């Protein structure tokens, strides 16, 4: 399974008149039909040269990304996040599922679901590692609460065991 990266696409932080149509026009100018693909997406905020992910989602909706990302409860999440970070630029990254051949946008909701679910969970874990305040409430139980000595989670008090040190080195690049 293959995914491509598109963006970042800047959002109108005031959600002024016709902000949705302006956003979609920008997306479609970048890549025709991108707004109707099945994919994962990340809402992020940029301040200077630093960008942090704040919300990770996925869509396999028949209306594609366009029918999913700006549902009212998600816009409310974005507004809450932006209210706490008023000087940051809001953006969205898109990660559409691609076909294995010819690198076209995949329309296979059934066969793509597992890959999209996996990518969303992986992106949430990655986002959580750089921003513990992400707005996602699902799929964060294990990344927040599982500890594997030397590999995952906050170290308990005391020295790492030799096995923990070896495990830590094993997963470092």
PLM feature spans:
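Boundary/linker segments flanking structured domains
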Residues: 1-54, 60-173
């Amino acid at each position: 399974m293959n995914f491509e990266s598109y963006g970042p696409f800047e959002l109108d932080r005031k959600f002024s008149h016709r902000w949705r149509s302006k956003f979609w026009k920008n997306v479609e100018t970048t890549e025709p039909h991108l707004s109707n693909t099945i994919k994962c997406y990340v809402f992020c905020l940029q301040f200077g040269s630093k960008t942090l992910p704040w919300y990770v989602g996925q869509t396999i909706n028949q209306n594609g990304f366009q029918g999913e990302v700006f549902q009212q409860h998600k816009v409310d999440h974005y507004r809450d996040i932006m209210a706490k970070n008023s000087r940051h630029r809001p953006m969205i990254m898109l990660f559409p599922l691609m076909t294995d051949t010819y690198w076209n946008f995949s329309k296979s909701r059934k066969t793509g679901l597992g890959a999209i679910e996996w990518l969303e969970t992986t992106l949430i874990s990655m986002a959580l590692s750089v921003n513990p305040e992400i707005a996602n409430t699902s799929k964060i139980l294990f990344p927040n609460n599982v500890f594997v000595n030397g590999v995952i989670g906050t170290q308990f008090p005391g020295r790492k065991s030799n096995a923990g040190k070896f495990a830590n080195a094993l997963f470092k690049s």
